[in-house]
Amino acid sequence: AQLADSFHLQQFFRSQLLGSAHEVQRLAQFVEHWKKVEDLFLTFAK
């Protein structure tokens, strides 16, 4: 039972890590997108 438990824990942590990595990636893309938008606004403002 203990081996199975630790295996499930590993699976759980792995999915959690993958999930947060995915979130971080999405956040980074979001930030990149806004930087581009900001650049556009700045070029138009000049």
Swiss-Prot record:
Alphabetized UniProt keyword annotations: Actin capping, Actin-binding, Calcium, Calmodulin-binding, Cytoplasm, Cytoskeleton, Repeat
UniProt GO MF annotations: actin binding; calmodulin binding
Spectrin repeat positions: 1-5, 7-14, 15-20, 21-26, 27-35, 39-46
KW Cytoplasm (keyword) present: yes
Main location: cytoplasm
Gene Ontology CC terms: cell cortex; cytoskeleton
Subcellular location: Cytoplasm, Cytoskeleton; Cytoplasm, Cell cortex
Record GO biological process: actin filament capping
Quaternary structure note: Associates with the gamma-tubulin complex in brain, but not in kidney, liver, sperm, or uterus. Like erythrocyte spectrin, the spectrin-like proteins are capable of forming dimers which can further associate to tetramers. Interacts with isoform 1 of ACP1. Interacts with CALM and EMD. Interacts (via C-terminal spectrin repeats) with TRPC4. Identified in a complex with ACTN4, CASK, IQGAP1, MAGI2, NPHS1 and SPTBN1. Interacts with CLN3; this interaction regulates the fodrin localization at the plasma membrane.
Similarity remark: Belongs to the spectrin family.
Summary of the function given for this chain in its UniProt record: Fodrin, which seems to be involved in secretion, interacts with calmodulin in a calcium-dependent manner and is thus candidate for the calcium-dependent movement of the cytoskeleton at the membrane.
Protein name: Spectrin alpha chain, non-erythrocytic 1
Name of encoding gene: SPTAN1
